Structure formats: C-alpha cells, structure tokens
Amino acid sequence: MVRTNVVSFVLFAAIVLCIGSIQIDGQKHTAPWIPEDNSICCKEHPSVGRCLPNIDDSAEKGGKCWKFCIEGCETGGFCKLFGHKHICHCNCSG
C-alpha cells in the first residue's frame, strides 16, 4: 500500500514539473535543459499574420512572409498549410 502511494506521488510530481516547464506561446515547446535556438529558420511564424500562397511567399511580389524569412534564412520562406489556414514557415538553411 505504501509503495503504491509513493509511486503515485512520484508520477504526480513528475507530471506537475513537466507541465510547469512548458511555455505556451506558439514558438517554444522544449524542455528547459535543451539549448534555446534563436534562429527563425525551420519554424512557423503565426505572428506574421495571414499568409496567402503565391503572394506572401513570392520573392518577385515582395511577399511579407518572404521578406520576413529572407532576413534570417538564406532560402526565404513559404506559406505552409496547417489545418484550414496557411502560416508563414521559414525554410531550413543548409
């Protein structure tokens, strides 16, 4: 009986600690011991706003997603479909 209570308490404490370490801001979902990557590449950026394919991700048309991503990533970005809407996604450089 005591062993069951100890195991239950340890599992509960582990879950509480894991939940407390997550920042829900749409950008960071990593454990605190993993080094933070400040690069905008290989990530989605909903903060850029609505992304219209072939317009906002076009270099020729000066699209806002392309402009945002080209400053930090060599290959720019594109409008990536998530569910029923497109979000600006910066390409992975390299």
Curated annotation (Swiss-Prot):
Record's signal peptide: 1-26
Location in or out of the cell: Secreted
Sorted UniProt keywords: Antimicrobial, Disulfide bond, Fungicide, Plant defense, Secreted, Signal
Any one of the GO CC terms: extracellular region
Disulfide bridge positions per record: 41-92, 51-79, 65-88, 69-90
InterPro entries: Defensin-like_20-28
GO annotation, biological process: defense response to fungus; killing of cells of another organism
Family statement: Belongs to the DEFL family.
Name this polypeptide is given: Defensin-like protein 21
Organism: Arabidopsis thaliana (Mouse-ear cress)
